[in-house]
């Protein structure tokens, strides 16, 4: 009887080639230009798509195995979290505001990224790039789903979680992340890779999924920690894909350098403006804090970002144009953003508050050059108004930046006492901006940004026609429950009552 000889096991490299490159084919019924119409749209020149390599060499069979294992662990933990009243294990109900912002602003962005990468998997001719983009598309949709599932337990007990999808499309502070992703999705395929692979995955994700998720652990929120670290292993692959695409473009043709540099300048600034939300969550909305926004920026921005640009310098890439202005703004942006959220808290689907004296002592230690000089006096003034029974509320409408769509609340890079406002006239109309970076982005692509959907202008159009009550109904905001000051809110009262029941026999 002949002995069966065991087949030699394929090496990882052979298996990767078999399940990616060998699945591709050359077009015959239509030309490549007809099948991939956008690949030349932006002026990027690619001579050999086979030069692109996936450092992880991940194939679909391995992908399903890894993700299924993570799913089993994830749902086991969040089921245990729900069954054991995990919502009562958090440090303080104020922490819920950070989760509400995350659900309204960040989770829909994950879904938008999923749609974008599905499109990139169709628009890139390279088989390796197609497979990597398709896997990332599934990743991003999974991230959105797991975040929504993890936070759905809080929706059973607390206000403000119920209408995150409406908030994403209609709420004024959610247009900041929405405009970021709409901008990326309406770009060509190569710019999209810079926008998401570099700006969102490298700049934003590092500063969100590491320090903020550690903050969730410090504050007893096992559900958020679980989805954060379940996603983090994917994010490492996503960052690598984005950086690999940057290097691939730069290596293919010298003419690609100025185009890529322009995109890095643009998307660094767009990502930095979006980070204002993350900094505010870290400095003000975590009752038990891990690190300040400044400390996180020093690690993940200055050190990691600096190392990245030193690595890219051999291709001719310099640090982004707005890098110095970003560094000057780090010690101010979270305070300025929180002050804005507090004065407009009648129009937010989460609660805000004046920091306690202990918290201001912490902020003073973390921001020794700025907090006591510029921001403690403002909080002290707001505290006096509240104690007198006349809490400050800004009932006017904020002027929005035409590019990033954030209210123009940030100050000049070299003068923290003066608001930074820029203006450009285009085709007989004036447009306003929060910074030089946003103005430069607009002036480079004015026809794109004059079409921006701005929520403050929308308030005076149909179907709202300037009616604040109609606006609240339109955005699914329940006044007196979802919005306003944390002190005296239903969330504060309910959390205290339920915690009391859980820890006493009374």
Where are these regions (language model features)?
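Long, hydrophobic, well-ordered secondary-structure blocks that form the structural core
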Residues: 103-177
């Amino acid at each position: 009887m002949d002995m069966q000889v065991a087949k030699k096991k394929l090496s990882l490299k052979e298996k990767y080639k078999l399940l990616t490159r060998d699945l591709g084919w050359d077009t015959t019924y239509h030309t490549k230009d007809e099948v991939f119409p956008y690949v030349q749209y932006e002026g990027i020149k690619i001579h050999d798509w086979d030069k692109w390599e996936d450092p992880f060499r991940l194939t679909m069979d391995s992908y399903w195995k890894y993700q299924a294992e993570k799913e089993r662990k994830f749902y086991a933990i969040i089921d245990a979290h729900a069954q054991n009243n995990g919502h009562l294990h958090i440090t303080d109900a104020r922490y819920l505001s950070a989760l509400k912002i995350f659900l309204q602003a960040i989770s829909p962005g994950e879904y938008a990224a999923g749609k974008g990468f599905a499109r990139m998997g169709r628009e890139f001719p390279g088989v390796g790039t197609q497979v990597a983009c398709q896997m990332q598309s599934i990743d991003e949709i999974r991230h959105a789903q797991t975040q929504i599932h993890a936070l759905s337990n809080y929706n059973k007990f607390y206000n403000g979680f119920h209408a995150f999808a409406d908030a994403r499309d209609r709420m004024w502070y959610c247009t900041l992340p929405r405009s970021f992703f709409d901008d990326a999705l309406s770009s060509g395929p190569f710019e999209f890779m810079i926008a998401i692979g570099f700006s969102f995955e490298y700049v934003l994700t590092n500063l969100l999924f590491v320090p903020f998720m550690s903050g969730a652990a410090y504050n007893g929120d096992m559900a958020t920690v679980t989805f954060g670290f379940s996603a983090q292993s994917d994010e490492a692959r996503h960052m690598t894909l984005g950086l690999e695409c940057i290097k691939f473009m730069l290596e293919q043709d010298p003419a690609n350098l100025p185009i890529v540099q322009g995109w890095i300048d643009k998307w660094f600034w767009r990502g930095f403006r979006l980070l204002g939300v993350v900094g505010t969550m870290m400095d003000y909305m975590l009752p038990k804090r891990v690190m300040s926004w400044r400390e996180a920026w020093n690690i993940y921005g200055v050190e990691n970002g600096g190392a990245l640009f030193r690595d890219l310098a051999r291709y001719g890439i310099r640090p982004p144009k707005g890098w110095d202005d970003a560094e000057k703004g780090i010690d101010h942006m979270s305070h300025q953003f929180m002050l804005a959220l507090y004065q407009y808290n009648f129009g937010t689907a989460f609660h805000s508050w004046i920091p306690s004296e202990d918290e201001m002592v912490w902020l003073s230690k973390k921001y020794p050059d700025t907090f006591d000089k510029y921001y403690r006096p403002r909080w002290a003034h707001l505290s006096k108004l509240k104690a007198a029974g006349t809490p400050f509320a800004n009932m006017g409408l904020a002027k929005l930046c035409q590019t990033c769509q954030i209210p123009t609340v940030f100050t000049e890079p070299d003068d923290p006492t003066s608001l930074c406002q820029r203006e450009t006239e285009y085709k007989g109309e004036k447009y306003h901006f929060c910074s030089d970076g946003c103005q430069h982005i607009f002036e480079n692509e004015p026809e794109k940004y004059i079409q921006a959907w701005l929520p403050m202008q929308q308030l005076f159009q149909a179907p709202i026609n300037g009616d604040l009550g109609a606006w609240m109904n339109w955005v699914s905001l329940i006044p007196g429950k979802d919005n306003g000051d944390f002190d005296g809110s239903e969330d504060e009262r309910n959390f205290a009552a339920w915690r009391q029941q859980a820890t006493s026999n009374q």
